Curated annotation (Swiss-Prot):
Main location group: nucleus
Biased composition (Pro residues): 437-457
Family statement drawn from the similarity comment of this UniProt entry: Belongs to the CTF/NF-I family.
Protein name: Nuclear factor 1 A-type
Domain of life assignment: Eukaryota
Length: 509
């Protein structure tokens, strides 16, 4: 795409990468033009003149492609949050033509109706979600008050919340048909087409000051018919920068699931990584009940056995063995063996790997590929995969190293801490056999458990020196697990020598 420095992590989501080539360039001009007209009216208490509106239109049409694409990326990120998580996959597949159209439900507002969003920053004009979809992906110039003109198709099962662009149509009334004939006839007469009625057939010459046929209609817009059709059919990514080509726009890394195509290099500083991870987590928490988009990749590493990628259950997806298929070939579902190998390939995405520009991806031959290439092949200082949100140096690993060091040093030895937190050394424990290794690390929360001490066996005391001796008394039993590291000592326990005579509890971490 254009310069990665202009994008944030949210603006580079695979959801956005897949849908951006299908956004019409007219949407940017139309939304901004309506906002400019509204601001002008509120400021000057009069409507914008034709000359001023035409100047604004020309300014918006000549805007840099980077600005248009950045706006479209932010708007797609908003729409993604407003679409229910279970329908986001269907939305991408249907808009990109990979799947027949199906209903895509959005999150309702407080009254259970279609939500409204502002398509621009610091704009007081709100648009219904279905209106936004029609303008964004079909390029139809609708006003924000044209929500009543939208008609859902008979195949739509939930017309109140469905935002599927293929299920949304625009009702055409008699006046629209009448004006369509007028515009068509007038436009054809200007092109001097002999097969169409001439201008004299539809326009009466004004007599005695009376208005003719065409004089009865006043066009309020600044777009001509041919210009409106042309700009409404142009994709927003048509005008691109040096790092963005139309050949790349025909595909998306949304369907190229190889680790090399999906990974981005990690940031150079951990502080930047932490900031972006926090921002991503906050954005994911905006929508109630929202889950990561990739069920097989956006979960925690421990839940990999409970979830599978949506490619495995999608009946319309090709099998991993028939990756490079022609457009005429049919779909086939993956076999069980292929599904297992596919899950193995998807497991590679759970590993946070630092890759450079020439790093070879750790992919298996069964990795799911589509006959497309990702939009961006250059790594940048950002994440594009929702699964890689944690730093490679996990705090859990450090906690394990702190609590359970090497087995050779800890076998049969347990550290002891004073109440003031200073360590007093280690001593061999006769009650813990040497070959017994400590179990896995304990959970983060452990309850204090009293340490049972036998009264019959003599305690192991330290040498002369008491508490200042480097070998302090330490007690344990084979039945005591390192998970129970809270020791409660009472005043009646004769096993400890240099302990104050009151009940104390501390943590032997």
């Amino acid at each position: 795409m254009y310069s990665p420095l202009c994008l944030t992590q949210d603006e580079f989501h695979p959801f956005i990468e897949a849908l951006l080539p299908h956004v019409r360039a007219f949407a940017y001009t139309w939304f901004n033009l309506q906002a400019r007209k509204r601001k002008y009216f509120k400021k000057h208490e009069k409507r914008m003149s034709k000359e001023e509106e035409r100047a604004v239109k020309d300014e918006l049409l000549s805007e840099k492609p980077e600005v248009k694409q950045k706006w479209a990326s932010r708007l797609l990120a908003k729409l993604r949050k407003d679409i229910r998580p279970e329908y986001r996959e269907d939305f991408v597949l249907t808009v990109t033509g990979k799947k027949p159209p199906c209903c895509v439900l959005s999150n309702p507002d407080q009254k259970g109706k279609m939500r409204r969003i502002d398509c621009l920053r610091q704009a007081d004009k709100v648009w219904r979600l279905d209106l936004v979809m029609v303008i964004l992906f079909k390029g139809i110039p609708l006003e924000s008050t044209d929500g009543e003109r939208l008609v859902k198709s008979p195949q739509c099962s939930n017309p109140g919340l469905c935002v599927q662009p293929h299920h949304i149509g625009v009702s055409v009334k008699e006046l629209d048909l009448y004006l369509a004939y007028f515009v068509h006839a007038a436009d054809s007469s200007q092109s001097e087409s002999p097969s169409q009625p001439s201008d004299a057939d539809i326009k009466d010459q004004p007599e005695n000051g009376h208005l003719g046929f065409q004089d009865s209609f006043v066009t309020s817009g600044v777009f001509s018919v041919t210009e409106l059709v042309r700009v409404s059919q142009t994709p927003i990514a048509a005008g691109t920068g040096p790092n963005f080509s139309l050949s790349d726009l025909e595909s998306s890394s949304y369907y190229s699931m190889s680790p090399g195509a999906m990974r981005r290099s990690l940031p150079s500083t951990s502080s930047t990584s932490s900031t972006k991870r926090l921002k991503s987590v906050e954005d994911e928490m905006d929508s109630p009940g929202e889950e990561p988009f990739y069920t097989g990749q956006g979960r925690s590493p421990g839940s990999g056995s409970q979830s599978s990628g949506w490619h495995e259950v999608e009946p319309g997806m090709p099998s991993p063995t028939t990756l490079k298929k022609s457009e005429k070939s049919g779909f086939s579902s993956p076999s069980p063996s292929q599904t297992s190998s596919l899950g193995t390939a998807f497991t590679q995405h759970h590993r946070p790997v630092i890759t450079g520009p020439r790093a070879s991806p750790h992919a298996t031959p069964s990795t799911l590929h589509f006959p497309t290439s990702p939009i961006i092949q250059q790594p940048g200082p950002y994440f594009s995969h929702p699964a890689i949100r944690y730093h490679p140096q996990e705090t859990l690993k450090e906690f394990v190293q702190l609590v359970c060091p090497d087995a050779g040093q800890q076998a049969g030895q347990v550290g002891f801490l004073n109440p003031n937190g200073s360590s007093q050394g280690k001593v061999h424990n006769p009650f813990l056999p040497t070959p017994m290794l400590p179990p896995p690390p304990p959970p983060p929360m452990a309850r204090p458990v009293p340490l049972p001490m036998p009264d019959t066996k003599p305690p192991t005391t330290s040498t002369e020196g008491g508490a200042a001796s480097p070998t302090s008394p330490t007690y344990s039993t084979p039945s005591t697990s390192p998970a129970n590291r809270f020791v409660s000592v009472g005043p009646r326990d004769p096993s400890f020598v240099n302990i104050p005579q009151q009940t104390q509890s501390w943590y032997l971490g």
